[in-house]
């Protein structure tokens, strides 16, 4: 199933680092830094595909669908990292953005032998979370040929769910199994085949864009403020106050009072202040406008 390593750009040798073991520490790091600078440019070239993906994910969220990441090794762990940040950052339900990794939970901290080579496991893991046609799958694999991920993608397509691929090799196997193919061609790694480096960095940048873009599109952001942030610790309690102040240009005391009245619901506090309404009225305005602050404050 997997493409031979010699045919993959991510597995080829990088001439810029062919003698990296002979360099001073500073020169070694300069080589790495020079290669890392190429990553953002590679992601920039993929922006049209990333745009399509964000719009698909936003549409899925509007239909109460879930975003499911699927990957193996570094790719799987990056999916877990991004998914786990969504509830505290955007106030999403725990299962709105989920991540699957080949080998299951134990593979997060330790490599599980041959887990990524199991084509059927990808399908089984999706079935175990009741993946359906309203959900959207994002397969992540630097090589673009990981059997576990391809198995999941094929199952998702078989039930008419939409599928996005994130990879770093042109014309990969994954590109033939998806609706949108995001290919960030970062080139050979500084350490041959170590796709946790440039490929992993590119994947993280893309995942940042997917969730952040989709959350903006679904009303989780006002201006550039995280208005659905959950106050789960002292730092975030303070951040909520600063968000309300920034959004409304009110005094600190007014922000604290509004947040207290609406039990720490940032959006409600902002709408209360900007529309001069009480908690119930502000909540009603938000409900009528699907949680979008900007529409809720239009007079």
Curated annotation (Swiss-Prot):
Tree of life domain: Bacteria
Function summary: Specifically catalyzes the cleavage of the D-lactyl ether substituent of MurNAc 6-phosphate, producing GlcNAc 6-phosphate and D-lactate. Together with AnmK, is also required for the utilization of anhydro-N-acetylmuramic acid (anhMurNAc) either imported from the medium or derived from its own cell wall murein, and thus plays a role in cell wall recycling.
Domain SIS: 57-220
Matching PROSITE patterns: GCKR, SIS
Active-site residues annotated for this sequence: 85, 116
UniProt record similarity statement: Belongs to the GCKR-like family. MurNAc-6-P etherase subfamily.
Cross-referenced NCBIfam families: N-acetylmuramic acid 6-phosphate etherase (TIGR00274), PRK05441.1 (NF003915), PRK12570.1 (NF009222)
Protein name (Swiss-Prot/TrEMBL): N-acetylmuramic acid 6-phosphate etherase
Subunit structure, as described in the record: Homodimer.
GO biological process assignments: 1,6-anhydro-N-acetyl-beta-muramic acid catabolic process; amino sugar catabolic process; N-acetylmuramic acid catabolic process; peptidoglycan turnover
Organism: Psychromonas ingrahamii (strain DSM 17664 / CCUG 51855 / 37)
This protein's record includes keyword Phosphoprotein: no
Protein's gene: murQ
Catalytic activity as recorded in UniProt: N-acetyl-D-muramate 6-phosphate + H2O = N-acetyl-D-glucosamine 6-phosphate + (R)-lactate
This protein's UniProt keywords: Carbohydrate metabolism, Lyase
Gene3D superfamilies in the record: 1.10.8.1080, Glucose-6-phosphate isomerase like protein, domain 1 (3.40.50.10490)
CDD domains: SIS_Etherase (cd05007)
Pathway named in the protein's UniProt entry: Amino-sugar metabolism; 1,6-anhydro-N-acetylmuramate degradation; Amino-sugar metabolism; N-acetylmuramate degradation; Cell wall biogenesis; peptidoglycan recycling
GO molecular function: carbohydrate derivative binding; carbon-oxygen lyase activity; ether hydrolase activity
EC number from the UniProt entry: 4.2.1.126
Additional record remark: A lyase-type mechanism (elimination/hydration) is suggested for the cleavage of the lactyl ether bond of MurNAc 6-phosphate, with the formation of an alpha,beta-unsaturated aldehyde intermediate with (E)-stereochemistry, followed by the syn addition of water to give product.
């Amino acid at each position: 199933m997997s493409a031979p390593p010699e045919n993959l750009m991510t597995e080829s040798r990088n001439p810029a680092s062919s003698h990296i073991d002979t360099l001073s520490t500073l020169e070694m790091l300069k080589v790495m830094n020079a290669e890392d600078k190429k990553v953002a440019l590679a992601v920039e070239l993929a922006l049209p595909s990333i745009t399509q993906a964000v719009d698909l994910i936003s549409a899925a969220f509007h239909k109460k669908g879930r975003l499911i990441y699927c990957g193996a090794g570094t790719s799987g762990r990056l999916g877990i990292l991004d998914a786990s940040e969504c509830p505290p950052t955007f106030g999403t339900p725990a299962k709105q953005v989920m991540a699957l990794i080949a080998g299951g939970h134990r593979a997060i901290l330790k490599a599980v032998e041959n887990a990524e080579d199991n084509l059927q496991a990808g399908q089984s893991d999706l079935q175990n979370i009741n993946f359906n046609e309203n959900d959207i799958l994002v397969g992540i694999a630097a090589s673009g040929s990981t059997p576990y991920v391809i198995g999941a993608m094929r199952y998702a397509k078989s039930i008419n769910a939409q599928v996005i691929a994130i990879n770093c090799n042109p014309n990969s196997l994954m590109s033939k199994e998806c609706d949108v193919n995001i290919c960030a061609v970062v080139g050979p790694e500084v350490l041959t085949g170590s796709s946790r480096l440039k490929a992993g960095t590119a994947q993280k940048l893309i995942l940042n864009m997917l969730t952040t873009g989709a959350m903006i599109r679904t009303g989780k952001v006002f201006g550039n403020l995280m208005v659905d942030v959950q106050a789960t610790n002292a730092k975030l309690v303070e951040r909520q106050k600063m968000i309300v102040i920034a959004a409304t240009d009110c005094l600190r005391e007014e922000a604290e009072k509004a947040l207290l009245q609406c039990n720490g619901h940032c959006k409600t506090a902002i709408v209360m202040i900007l529309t001069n309404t009480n908690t119930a009225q502000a909540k009603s305005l938000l409900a009528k406008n699907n949680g979008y602050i900007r529409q809720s404050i239009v007079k």
